[in-house]
Swiss-Prot record:
It is an enzyme of class 3 (hydrolase). The gene is CPB1. Residues 1-15 form the signal peptide. Disulfide bonds join C173-C186, C245-C268, C259-C273. It is found in: Secreted; Zymogen granule lumen. This is Carboxypeptidase B. Its cofactor is Zn(2+). Residues 118-412 form the Peptidase M14 domain. Residues 16-110 form a propeptide. It catalyses: Preferential release of a C-terminal lysine or arginine amino acid.
Length: 416
């Protein structure tokens, strides 16, 4: 056994070697009351390098909301002076980002093998997709639906008992590279499917009657970059013509109101929509797969973080979907079910009004393809840790999310 347990010391330097160290950086939360406050934050963002965590961009700030953003150490005093001089109410969520990053891992001594209760790098996840498939050939098959900009295979797991013409649910994780709890959930879902099939009645029924297409990591290149260079990286790693700025926001790259609102045409921005809809190899691979399997896919679930929300269309427009009442009731019930385990409170509603307008999202695109049950899950937390959710919260987060996913699945199964 010891021959297979190679222990390595993991520190921030080794997990993110030769990259950003984040020493002394802070995460602020500002209370925004009115348009004047919004204008002030626009002014701040134009003069300082601000990394917006929630919302994703300064352009998405709304009155009567809170705004979370990261500030580099050398800009801290200037930002604090600006906030105080303009009487903007704020608090510091994270006082030293490096310290929180170091504490994210439960232990500095880690096994090199896969663990469902720890964050796994892409090399480990890739090996896991092969292993979990080979160990469960009667439940799981693996295919590569495309490659990333840097040539990594985009693996999709088909989870379910083999059968003809089965309806399916598509679920993806890892759109935004820094949202590590998202990646962890797709792995946890597969774990639950494997462990509880034949023992737990709902999962057994689901896998007998449905297939789950599970995409563990879409933005593989970006995810690798968060482990090797910059933990706060969000976008893909594709090059852009005419600039040294790298990457596109994959969740602004779908042909759903593409680049009309809540998205940027500037390749240097975190919400850059790309040179065209589906310009990214990753989003094109996902969209092609769904288009090719549209007759069987009955629900689309995309997992993100953070803010504890279940969202449904639309985000690119304030219009409501045709089955708004049904989606609202389903989201409400799923949120209630989720809270039964640990009391975690989620909000729910249409994306544009519940969180912020954002064009080019995969959930809106899937809905417009005719998949009428389309949801975005924004997992824990509400900002205490933000994208740096500790490993100690992986299990609880995944367990409660499973309740909501299973509730939605059961509903979809009953409304085919």
């Amino acid at each position: 056994m010891l021959a297979f347990l190679i222990l390595v010391t993991v520190t921030l330097a080794s997990a993110h070697h030769s990259g950003e160290h984040f020493e002394g950086e802070k995460v602020f939360r500002v209370n925004v009351e009115d348009e004047n406050d919004i204008s002030l934050l626009h002014e701040l963002a134009s003069t300082r390098q601000i990394d917006f965590w929630k919302p994703d961009s300064v352009t998405q700030i709304k009155p009567h909301s809170t705004v979370d953003f990261r500030v580099k150490a050398e800009d801290i005093l200037a930002v604090e002076d600006f906030l105080e001089q303009n009487e903007l109410q704020y608090e510091v969520l994270i006082n030293n980002l490096r310290s929180v990053l170091e504490a994210q891992f439960d232990s500095r001594v880690r096994t090199t093998g896969h663990s469902y209760e720890k964050y796994n790098n892409w090399e480990t996840i890739e090996a896991w997709t092969k292993q979990v498939t080979s160990e469960n050939p009667d439940l799981i098959s693996r295919t590569a639906i495309g490659t990333t900009f840097l040539g990594n295979n985009i693996y999709l797991l088909k989870v379910g008992k083999p059968g003809p013409n089965k309806p399916a649910i598509f679920m993806d994780c890892g759109f935004h590279a820094r949202e590590w709890i998202s990646h962890a959930f797709c792995q946890w879902f597969v774990r639950e499917a494997v462990l509880t099939y034949g023992y737990e009645s709902h999962m057994t029924e689901f896998l007998n009657k449905l297939d789950f297409y599970v995409l563990p990591v879409l933005n593989i290149d970006g995810y690798i970059y968060t482990w090797t260079k910059n933990r706060m990286w969000r976008k893909t790693r594709s090059t852009n013509a005419g600039t040294t700025c790298i990457g596109t926001d994959p969740n602004r790259n779908f042909d759903a109101g593409w680049c009309t609102t809540g998205a940027s045409t500037d390749p240097c921005d975190e919400t850059y929509c790309g040179s065209a809809a589906e310009s990214e190899k990753e989003t094109k691979a996902l969209a092609d797969f769904i288009r090719n399997n549209l007759s069987s896919i009955k629900a689309y679930l995309t997992i993100h973080s953070y803010s504890q929300m279940i969202l449904y269309p639309y985000s690119y427009d304030y219009k409501l979907p045709e089955n708004n009442a049904e989606l609202n009731n389903l989201a409400k019930a799923a949120v209630k079910e989720l809270a039964t385990l640990y009391g975690t409170k989620y909000t729910y509603g249409p994306g544009a009004t519940t969180i912020y307008p954002a064009a080019g999202g995969s959930d809106d695109w899937a809905y417009d393809q005719g998949i009428k049950y389309s949801f975005t899950f924004e997992l824990r937390d509400k900002g205490r840790y933000g994208f740096i959710l500790p490993e100690s919260q992986i299990q609880a987060t995944c367990e409660e999310t499973m309740l909501a996913i299973k509730y939605v699945t059961n509903y979809v199964l009953g409304h085919l």
